[in-house]
Design a protein with these regions (language model features):
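Catalytic machinery of carbohydrate-active enzymes
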Residues: 1-328
């Protein structure tokens, strides 16, 4: 029989008493997807302060969610969640006191394998499944969409959720401008030669520029113009945490619609994100000084370098004119 997910609130439309135990979040997806989930993690932490938080996903990424127990979604134990064998004893023990499990799955409960949902429910009967993808015609930001599993459950939620990455100590701010010319999807990349022109303009203005390479484009760095792939300062962070530290110390970040842009905004780094085929109303980075330039007709080939230079010049001028640092 197909697994039936309760459409009414399993919390009875009243706040659940915080009696300890644990609360859990299952979240796959790329780096930027996880960053947009940080408001949900904060809501769980704020509403269940006496409960342990368990994060299931990529441990390198979930580290950005703060103090928590981490379960690798790629490890052998979790892989068994997709089989008829049921949850392995190690997971059953870890989730024995789980009072609430939120799972964000592509397509929501209707698209997930029944056996997987059955095994999640075996870990925690108090389960809510949310859709990690936009709904048709959606215009609200994805941070709001990802809070839907909690929205009608009497749990306090922020009116304007904003992802925040809490670093134990803020790195000293420098005068480095970070450029990120890559992306996990080439269709989301502004032409590399435009980044070369932008880099040269920044250097003429006296800025120190670093070029950031993530795992998505590291293997094909040689495809980029030498002015980018052989720039004096290259940043190749070994982890999402190291990436966050680099960005927290930067003066400004300019890049495509990618995960690092969301990380930059979440650590309080002023950002300029270049959007093409994706809708910034849903996916733009959220931060105290996060800006977006949308390509004409959603085509990054038509986004002129002059437009981006003008937006960069305005943002940097505002930063220079401000006596106060941007607050996280």
């Amino acid at each position: 029989q197909p697994v039936k997910i309760q459409e009414t609130g399993f919390l009875g439309k009243r706040p659940m008493a915080d009696a300890g135990g644990s609360v859990a979040l299952v979240r796959g997806g790329a780096l930027g997807d996880f960053i947009l989930t940080l408001p949900l993690i904060r809501a769980l932490r704020d509403n269940f302060p006496r409960s342990r938080l368990v994060l299931v996903g990529d441990p390198s990424t979930t580290r950005l969610g703060g103090a928590a127990e981490r379960v690798s979604a790629e490890a052998g134990d979790w892989a068994r969640m997709y089989t008829q064998d049921g949850p392995p004893p190690t997971l059953a023990d870890q989730f024995a006191d789980c009072r609430l499990l939120v799972a964000l799955l592509p397509g929501g409960p209707g698209a997930a394998p029944d056996v997987y949902l059955e095994n999640l429910r075996a870990l925690c009967t108090q389960m809510r499944v949310g859709d990690s993808q936009p709904e048709p015609g959606q215009t609200r930001h994805m941070t709001q969409r990802l809070l839907d599993p909690l929205r009608d459950e009497g749990i306090d939620l922020p009116d304007a959720p904003q992802p925040r990455i809490e670093l134990p100590s803020a790195p000293a701010k420098g005068d480095v401008v970070i450029l990120h010319p890559g992306s996990g999807g080439r269709h989301k990349c502004w032409p590399a030669q435009h980044f070369v022109t932008l880099l040269a303009w920044l250097q003429r203005q006296g800025w120190q520029v670093a070029v950031l390479w993530g795992p998505a484009e590291e293997a094909r760095r040689g495809e980029f113009p030498p002015a980018l792939s052989e720039a004096a300062t290259q940043l190749c962070p070994a982890s999402a945490w190291e990436l966050a530290l680099y960005l927290a110390a930067a003066k400004f970040y300019i890049g495509n619609d990618t995960g690092p842009g969301h990380v930059a905004a979440a650590v309080g780094c002023p950002t300029l994100s270049l959007f093409g085929p994706t809708d910034p109303r849903l996916w733009r980075p959220l931060g105290p000084a996060a800006r977006v330039v949308q390509a004409p007709a959603c085509d990054l080939e038509r986004l002129g370098v002059g437009t981006v230079i003008d937006a960069t010049a305005e943002a940097l001028a505002n930063l220079e004119a401000s006596d106060e640092p941007v607050e996280h």
